[in-house]
Amino acid sequence: MGQEPKGIESRKIQDGHVRKKVGRQQGLWVRTTKKEKFSRMSRDANV
């Protein structure tokens, strides 16, 4: 296996950026689903 520090480092940095983006998106998604669940629960309680 040929060692390429530069390539590995850049890949790690890119991976980190992607993970941050995905994490942010997942966080928003989780928040929205929680809101939906809460509204659904309150609706059921009212009915």
Curated annotation (Swiss-Prot):
Basic and acidic residues bias spans: 1-17, 33-47
Region (Disordered): 1-47
Function: Involved in the control of extracellular enzymes production. Stimulates PEL, PEH, CEL, and PRT production.
Designated name of the protein: Exoenzymes regulatory protein AepH
